């Protein structure tokens, strides 16, 4: 199964030439009070991630000395157990999606062994599926055990940072309107979820 996913990603790379540009644009670096550099990763949707995403993340690792890595959600897609969309029976099963997902998550953990990850609509799908069926979260394994990662990866509902200009609120989603998000939190907001939107 892992080999099939690798092959499909290789094939996608060959057909999608528009994404073959060299990584020349440096990312935006958030400076905190201690001048920390924070890498924000959002919406990978493993195993359906973009074929260049891991190459890109590896280049960022080699190019910058990140003080902190915050994954603002949807690290996994969990299409096979989705509670709010029709499940495509021709896509990988839950077991297959987990097997392939763990393969890629291990690569990500090797690149970034310390990470804060935020609860999200896809990343939290196992819990959402259990709750939809009336099962308590206390019957479930934690994310670290499900994905076979160390306790250096920490899942949280949201995360706050403070820099010289004020506070930054990190969450998977607050509001599609970023101005409303900022007003609601009375702080700068960094969120994911809205794939086609990029606002400052």
Segments the model singles out, each with a brief description of its role:
Residues 41, 46-150:
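Core catalytic region of metal-dependent phosphoesterases/phosphodiesterases
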Residues 37-46, 166-174:
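Active-site-proximal beta-strand elements of phosphoester/diester hydrolases
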Residues 31-34, 62-65, 109-111, 148, ...:
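Flexible, charged surface loops at secondary-structure boundaries
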Residues 1-40:
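Acidic, histidine-bearing metal-coordination/catalytic regions of metal-dependent phosphoesterases
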Residues 147-164, 177:
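Short acidic low-complexity segments
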Residues 36-38, 68-70, 168-169, 188-190:
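Structural motif
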Residues 21-23, 51-52, 152-153, 170-173:
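Short gly/ser/thr-rich secondary-structure transition/capping motifs
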Residues 164-200:
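Conserved beta-sheet core of the metallophosphoesterase superfamily
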